[in-house]
Amino acid sequence: MDKTKLIAVAACLALFINPGCNKDNPSDPDEKETKPTKEMFDSDYFETYVDPVTGVVSYLFRSDVFSSTTKYNTQSAYFSSKDMTDDERFCYFFISTKEQNGQMSTERSARVFDFKERKFYTFAGNSGCYPFLDPKKDILYFYVMGNKTNSGKVRDNGQFFKKDLLNAPRKTEELAKIPKAVAPSGSYMSRACSHITLTQDKRKVLLDAWVNNSFIQGLLNLYTGEWEEWSRNYTTHLTHGQMNPKRSDEALFAIDVWEDSNGETHKIVYDHDGAYGGQGTYPRMQLMKPDGTRTTISPSPDNNYATHEGWLEDGDHVYWCAGGVHIRNIRTGEYEHVYGQRATHCNISTDLKYVTFDNDHPDYYRGGRWKVCFLNRETGKTIDIITQRPAITTKDKPSQLHPDPHPHFVCNNKYIVCTSSDDEGYLRWCITPVDQLIRLTSK
C-alpha cells in the first residue's frame, strides 16, 4: 500500500503478545469493557488507512503479523455474516498466502483475534462453508469437510465444531458429523452448507447440501446428530441457505445455476406465473418451510432480477441487490427501493437507517478494483469508505479466493467490516467506525 495512505496510530500498546502464544487462563468472561479505538487498532496489528478522496478512516489488519518472513492475506466474512462479537472482544478472518497470477494460494486457514489479550487462535475455516460467530455469546461454530478419496471421486464425510472463545478459546468441541442420510458412503459431497446458520436455540444447523446430483435441505442437530429433512430434489440448485434470524420454521434459499456430473449446465428457470409481462418471476429468492414447500419472493416490480440476498434482523424483511438495493416485507409483500445506483453486495443496519454496499465498477471481475460505500437513508447522502480498492489480479487471470469486499455491519452497527486490498496485491481485513460516516453524511 502506498505509504502516503498509511498513517501509524500515535498510541501503541506497551504489551505485545506473540501471536502463537496462548495463556492457560483466559480472561474473566464477565469483563465486557472495550478499549478506546486507538488502542483497539494499535499499530502492532493494524495500519490506519485514510481514503484519499473522502477522508474516511479505516483500520487494516497488517499482513506481516503472523510471520517474520511471510506476509498473508486476511479476508472478512460474507456480507450476510457477522465476524465480530457485540462486546468487541473477538473477530475472525480467513488467512492465505498471496495468489500468484490467479492461482489459488498454497496455504489457507482462519484465525480468531482476541482484541483484549492481543493474541490469535487458529481454526479450520476453509471448507467452503462460512463459520458462524455468535455475536452475543462469543461462541464460534465451524465446519471441516472430509478428505477426498478414491482418486478424488469420493468425499462423503464432514463434521461441525465449536469454540467457546470467552471460557476456553484453545479448546475445540466436536459436534455432529454429516449423516449418511445426507451423504451416503461412496458419494461425492460438493457442499454441506453455504453458511452456518442456526435455529433459535443454537442446537441445529441448516444444511443446503449438494451431494452427487442432488440438493438436500434440512436441520442437523449438532449435539445428537438427528437429521430432519425438509426437501430433496435433483433439478433445482438451492444454495445460500439462511435460517430466519427470529424463528426456526423457515429459511431463505437462493436458486442458482449448476453443472451436473456429466458436465451439463442447468440454468435458472423462470416461474410459469405469467408475471413481468409474461416472462415469469425470476425465482432467485426462495422461502422454504419444514415440510419442503417453497414460495418465490418477488424481486422489484421494475427489475425482474435479484442476487446476494439476506435477512433483515426482524425476520420479516429480506434485502437483495439488483443494480441497487431493495427490501421486501415477506409477510405483507410491501416493497421498498432503497438505493438506485450500482450495488453488488449490501448489508443494512438493524434500525434500517444505514446501508453499506460495494461496487465492482469498472472492472467487473473477481480480483479487480472495487469501491465500498455507505448510505445514510435519513439524509439520502452517500460516501465512499474506500473510493477504489486496488486490483489484486488481472482480468485474464481472475482471483480464486472470492476476494469481493462483502461489507457488513457488526457490533450493533458500530463498525463496518469488509475485505480491502493494498498496492502489493494482499487482501486486508478492514474495519471502519460508523460514527464518522454518519457525521460526514449528515452535513
State each model region's role:
Residues K35-F41, S96-S105, M145-D156, R203, ...:
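Short, conserved, GDST-rich strand-edge loop motifs in beta-rich repeat architectures
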Residues F123-N213, W227-T236:
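Asp-box/WD-like beta-propeller blade repeats and closely related beta-sheet repeat scaffolds
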Residues L401-K443:
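Blade-level signature of beta-propeller repeat domains, shared across WD40, Kelch, NHL, RCC1
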